[in-house]
């Protein structure tokens, strides 16, 4: 309040909702309850609630966005797409958690930024906005697409033990 900002946009994740079943006709909505399944998603859900509490207590102009998986320029190198590209270009094994059938909705970073800009200028204070790409792919399909695009062999795929609390699908 002291800085007189016109609006605070809190960037969160769809992981705070937990896991969807594999029926691709259902998606998270702004009324889906928070059900995080990992310490990471629990920390994000906690931060969402903290932001909401500050907004209510101090009458702050706040929006919360919950987006799906981003991809695009300058992504952190440990994320699936840049990691896969780096490993393949160096003829190293690409780790795939479990059977690779985890489904993610992919959203280009430009589209995410565009949505944030719209919310900044037209969003209703206090609202939560879900931002998705309606572009669901399994992790294995993403990796195979990159491998084939670069012209390498699927023998570079190495299935590794799945992470604890790893949601099968969120979108």
Predicted features along the sequence, with ranges:
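Active-site Tyr-X1-5-Lys
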Residues: 19-22, 35-63, 85-90
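Active-site loop of short-chain dehydrogenase/reductase
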Residues: 3-8, 20, 60-61, 93, ...
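Short glycine-/acidic-enriched loop or helix-start segments at secondary-structure transitions
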Residues: 19-21, 74, 140-142
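Active-site loop/turn elements of alpha/beta-hydrolase fold enzymes
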Residues: 13, 67, 99
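Conserved Rossmann-fold NAD(P)-dependent oxidoreductase catalytic core, especially the SDR/UDP-sugar
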Residues: 1-37
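C-terminal substrate-binding subdomain of Rossmann-fold SDR/epimerase-dehydratase oxidoreductases
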Residues: 82, 88-171
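Hydrophobic structural elements of the Rossmann-like NAD(P)H-binding subdomain
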Residues: 9-11, 65, 84
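Flexible, glycine-rich beta-alpha linker
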Residues: 17-18, 35-39, 63-80, 103
């Amino acid at each position: 309040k002291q800085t007189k900002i016109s609006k605070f946009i809190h960037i969160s994740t769809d992981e705070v909702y937990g896991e969807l079943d594999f029926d691709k006709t259902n998606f998270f909505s702004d009324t889906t309850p928070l059900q995080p399944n990992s310490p990471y998603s629990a920390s994000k859900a906690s931060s969402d609630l903290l932001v909401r509490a500050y907004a209510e207590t101090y009458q702050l102009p706040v929006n919360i966005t919950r987006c799906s998986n981003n991809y695009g320029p300058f992504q952190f190198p440990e994320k699936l797409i840049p990691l896969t590209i780096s490993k393949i270009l160096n003829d190293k094994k690409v780790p795939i958690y479990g059977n690779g059938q985890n489904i993610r909705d992919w959203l280009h970073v430009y589209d995410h930024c565009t949505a944030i800009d719209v919310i900044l200028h037209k969003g209703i204070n206090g609202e939560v906005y879900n931002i998705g790409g309606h572009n669901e792919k399994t992790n294995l399909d993403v990796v195979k697409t990159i491998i084939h695009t670069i012209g390498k062999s699927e023998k570079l795929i190495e299935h590794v033990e799945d992470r604890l609390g790893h949601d099968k699908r969120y979108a």
